[in-house]
Amino acid sequence: LGMGSSVTASAQINPLIAAASPLLFRAAAIRNTATQDDIYGLRGEFVSELTAFDHRARALGEDGELLSDARYALCTFVDETVLNTPWGSQSKWQEDSLLSTFFNETWGGDRFFVILDRAKQQPGRNLALLELQFVCLMLGFEGNNYVLEWCRSRLD
């Protein structure tokens, strides 16, 4: 009986990942593109998708600081993904990034890891956020090499 309930609990879908899936797929799809004809249109799509993420996550019961931290992670992930493409690095994306639009900040690589460290202090409460950040890392988020410094500091 106890084993069945733990299997059921572990098989539940992470609401943040479920809400972010369209955005994550879209960002992953542009990672290896050679050109982007309409960068402002793409930015508009991501702004709309982040707003939709918010609505979907709230409908699934997420809110407050956890939702804000998840949105922050997604903004930094998308911004870094775009800026690491040949066309994104030559664009004005950095000047009008998702992070600047949603959080009035221009650099979020290190804060992503501050949020991660804070979430790890209460993993049971923050599991959905931790898993979402893990997905961002697995899809290539590096915090512009901040991850190397962060990992080294954990190994010492």
Predicted features by range, described:
Residues 68, 73-148:
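Membrane-proximal low-complexity regions enriched in glycine and acidic/polar residues
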Residues 151-156:
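Juxtamembrane amphipathic/hinge helix adjacent to a transmembrane helix
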Residues 1-80:
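Non-catalytic, solvent-exposed interaction/assembly segments
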Residues 1, 147-150:
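Cationic, amphipathic, low-complexity alpha-helical segments enriched
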